[in-house]
Curated annotation (Swiss-Prot):
Superkingdom of origin: Bacteria
Annotated GO CC locations: plasma membrane
Membrane topology: Multi-pass membrane protein
Keywords: Cell membrane, Membrane, Transmembrane, Transmembrane helix
Keyword check for Signal: no
Name this polypeptide is given: Uncharacterized protein MG384.1
Length: 149
């Protein structure tokens, strides 16, 4: 019975662990080649890569011991590695988008519009404060004029 499960499980290990590992290595090379910054979120990526290699090694080192506990252990290892892989793929995609020129252009435009909005607000506040000063100066002047000497 265990001999029938083994090739299917090894195929699952190959496609769901080894292929994402290759994708990560490509993305990591791409990110390190085209950015000036060290990406700290790649540290858990290194751990998940090591974890993936451990799972692959575990699948090859215990081929004859096919009891239910080892199958369950390997299943959970694959599941945890998949969850880590999707999380890291999302993180790396976000970093790639942030570092891209298109995102930088969008951010610069947003900064420009934000600066112009703040300048307009500052001008409006300055006009309002000038009007209030003039009004208060006129009131003070009128009060001073009315006082008998």
């Amino acid at each position: 019975m265990g001999k029938e499960i083994e090739p299917i499980f090894d195929l699952v290990l190959l496609w769901f662990l080894f292929v994402p590992l290759l994708i990560y290595l490509f993305l990591a090379f791409f990110l390190f080649a085209f950015t000036k910054y060290i990406i700290w979120e790649l540290i858990p990526f290194c751990y998940s890569t090591a974890f993936t290699l451990i799972v692959l090694f575990l699948s090859g080192i215990i081929p004859m011991a096919w009891n239910s506990w080892i199958i369950l252990l390997r299943f959970f290892l694959v599941l945890i590695t998949l969850m880590l892989s999707f999380f890291l793929l999302n993180k790396m995609t976000n970093f790639f988008l942030i570092r891209s020129k298109y995102a930088i252009i969008i951010a610069e435009n947003l900064l420009k519009t934000g600066k112009s909005k703040t300048k307009n607000r500052q001008k409006l506040q300055q006009i309002q404060s000038d009007l209030e000063r003039k009004k208060s100066a006129e009131i003070v002047f009128k009060i001073k004029k009315k006082k008998p000497k």
